[in-house]
Amino acid sequence: MAEGSRLYFAVTVLMCAFVSINGVGLNDLLERASQLSDKLHSLSTSLTNDLDSHFPPVGRVMMPRPSMCHTSSLQIPNDKDQALKVPEDELLSLARSLLLAWSDPLALLSSEASSLAHPERNTINSKTKELQDNINSLGAGLERVVHKMGSSSDNLSSLPFYSNSLGQDKTSRLVNFHFLLSCFRRDSHKIDSFLKVLRCRAAKKRPEMC
């Protein structure tokens, strides 16, 4: 089975398990959430590698700085030690805020992927749609975590995304696609880290074991 097929199968199984949850305990919910967020980050990394396989050298020069990511204004822990000091409900809100912030950008990437000037565009298109499905499933799962924890479902940071185009020429579109994906990959790692800290706390492990 090819890498993409294996990853798709694993993500699909996790998604089906997540959306069918009823009466599952908090520990199990967070375990499944952290598994799904890990797949999310793995998929974004795989997509980045696909893009890098045929990326023009000029694209590296044109690439915006990470500080230009639309989620860069969100104040978040920089590492695990800082995350361990953040209250559970706040950490969950940060993960959900980041996840919600990628709804529109991923819709844009999904709509543009099939027409990218890239030899792997079919694979990129397929994986981008998987990302959308993955995010929707994780978002639904985190709503269940909110309910279990008794946290506020409205305590989310607004991180609007205003662009509705990746550019007019093929190079700009490819560069901006890569840039958005790199921003998402960074944020997916943060989401994964936050959920793993929450899972660790729910299991009442010592901080040094997290």
UniProtKB/Swiss-Prot annotation:
UniProt subcellular location: Secreted
InterPro entries, per the entry: 4_helix_cytokine-like_core, Somatotropin/Prolactin, Somatotropin_CS
Signal peptide start-end: 1-23
GO cellular component, one term: extracellular space
Listed Pfam families: Hormone_1
Domain of life: Eukaryota
A GO molecular function held by the record: hormone activity
Tissue distribution of the protein: Pituitary gland.
Paired cysteines (S-S): C69-C183, C200-C210
Nucleotide-binding recorded as keyword: no
PROSITE patterns listed in its UniProt record: SOMATOTROPIN_1 (PS00266), SOMATOTROPIN_2 (PS00338)
Family: Belongs to the somatotropin/prolactin family.
Protein name, entry field: Prolactin
Gene symbol of the encoding locus: prl
